[in-house]
Amino acid sequence: MKLTLLRHGETDGSRRDLYYGAADIPALPESLAALHENAAAYPRAKRYYTSGLLRTEQTLQALYGDVPHVQLPGLQEMNFGDFEMKSYQELKDTAAYQAWITDVEHNVCPNGESAKSEAKRS
């Protein structure tokens, strides 16, 4: 069996260096256009899966068109809770962020999850 993992197209969140995982933000139109333009370079598969988030659905569509696929919410990225859509600069001096960043594997983001719980879920 061969498994190929692809990350979704670029988002405003990635461009602005924001923490986001659970936020259902779209991929940028220019990113989707570039993916579509270069789709022939990406491997084809017998089965396709997405996390169900908009950016993953858009990326699949840009690369492969209307292929049948399965949405697996367990593939969603880490839920950063109260840190979602915020930057390091916004968070760095807060006690909650400092508590979390000391051990991201085990410490839980406020109203979010730890890296360990995300890995277990995935």
What are these regions (language model features)?
Residues 63-121:
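Phosphate-handling substructures
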Residues 34, 121-122:
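Hydrophobic alpha-helical membrane-association signature
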Residues 2-67, 116:
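Active-site-proximal alpha-helix that buttresses catalytic centers in soluble enzyme cores
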Residues 1, 12-13, 41-42, 73-76, ...:
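Short linear sequence motifs
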